[in-house]
C-alpha cells in the first residue's frame, strides 16, 4: 500500500497509523466473515445480500463487503478456507499421535473427530456445519469445497483408509469416500440446526456424536460389495 502511495506522489501516513489501519482491516474482515457464515447458515447462501452482511457485521457502510471480497464466491471460498485450515491443524495433530500401525478405525477417527471438535469448540450456536452442507450441494459453489478440500492431512487420511481396505475395488472405494463426505456434512448440519433451535439431541456431546459417525463409516467401508453385471447396465 505504501509503495503505491509513494509512486503516486502521496505522503506516507504518520508512524503507527498504517499498523493501526491494518489492524482495523483485519478486524473488519473477520467481522464480515462471522456475519456471513451466520446469515448463510440461517437463511441460505443465495438469499443473503452483501448489504445484509455488512449491516450484520455492524458496519455503517453496508457496501464494505465488496471492498474485501470481489464476489460472493470469493467470500464463500474465504469461509471454507478459514474453517478447513482449523480442521486440518487439528487433523495433523491427531495423525501425529497415531501408533506405528494405525487401523481403519484410527484413520476414520482422524477424518471425523477434528471436524466435530471444531464445531463443539465454536458454540453453541455454531453455523459452519449448515453452511458447509449448503455449499457442498450447490451446483455453482460445490467446486469451491472440492478445490479447498485437498490438503496434506486429508490426503494422508485417505491413503491410510485405502491401505486398510485393499479388497475394495477403486471405484467402490471412491464411491464410499463420497458417501462418507455426505454423511458427515449432513449429519453435522442436522445436529447443528437442532442445537440452534434449542432441541435435545442424542448423543448430547459432539465427541460422542463423532464416535457414532466413526462406527457408521467403519461399518460402511467394511460392508460387502455386491458384484455389478456391467452388461445389464443401460447407458
Predicted regions and their residues:
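C-terminal peripheral helix-coil segments that are non-catalytic and often amphipathic
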Residues: 1-11, 151-235
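An amphipathic alpha-helix adjacent to DNA-recognition modules
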Residues: 29-34, 68-92, 96
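Short hydrophobic clusters on alpha-helical segments that form packing/core surfaces
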Residues: 32-40, 217
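Helix-turn-helix
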Residues: 39-42, 46-74, 78
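Residue-level detector of well-ordered alpha-helical segments, enriched
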Residues: 79, 107, 111, 124-131, ...
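Hydrophobic alpha-helical connector segments
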Residues: 91-128, 177
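Amphipathic alpha-helical packing segments from all-alpha helical-bundle domains
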Residues: 106-109, 124-128, 139-165
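Short alpha-helical scaffolding segments that buttress acidic/His motifs in well-ordered protein cores
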Residues: 111, 115, 129-136, 180, ...
Amino acid at each position: 500500500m505504501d509503495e503505491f502511495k509513494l509512486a503516486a506522489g502521496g505522503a506516507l501516513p504518520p508512524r503507527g497509523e498504517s499498523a493501526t489501519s491494518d489492524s482495523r482491516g483485519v478486524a473488519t474482515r473477520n467481522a464480515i466473515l462471522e456475519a456471513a457464515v451466520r446469515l448463510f447458515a440461517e437463511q441460505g447462501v443465495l438469499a443473503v445480500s452483501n448489504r445484509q452482511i455488512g449491516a450484520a457485521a455492524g458496519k455503517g457502510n453496508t457496501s464494505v463487503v465488496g471492498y474485501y471480497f470481489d464476489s460472493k464466491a470469493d467470500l464463500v471460498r474465504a469461509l471454507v478456507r478459514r474453517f478447513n485450515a482449523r480442521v486440518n491443524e487439528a487433523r495433523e495433530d491427531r495423525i501425529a499421535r497415531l501408533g506405528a500401525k494405525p487401523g481403519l478405525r484410527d484413520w476414520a477417527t482422524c477424518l471425523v473427530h477434528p471436524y466435530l471438535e471444531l464445531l463443539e469448540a465454536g458454540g453453541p450456536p455454531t453455523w459452519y456445519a449448515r453452511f458447509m452442507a449448503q455449499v457442498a450441494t450447490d451446483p455453482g459453489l460445490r467446486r469451491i469445497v472440492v478445490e479447498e478440500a485437498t490438503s496434506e492431512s486429508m490426503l494422508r487420511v485417505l491413503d491410510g483408509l485405502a491401505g486398510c481396505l485393499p479388497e475394495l475395488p477403486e471405484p467402490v472405494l471412491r464411491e464410499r469416500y463420497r458417501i462418507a463426505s455426505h454423511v458427515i456434512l449432513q449429519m453435522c448440519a442436522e445436529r447443528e440446526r437442532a442445537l440452534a433451535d434449542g432441541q435435545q439431541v442424542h448423543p448430547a456431546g459432539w465427541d460422542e456424536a463423532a464416535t457414532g459417525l466413526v462406527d457408521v463409516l467403519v461399518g460402511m467401508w467394511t460392508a460387502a460389495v455386491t458384484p455389478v453385471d456391467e452388461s445389464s447396465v443401460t447407458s
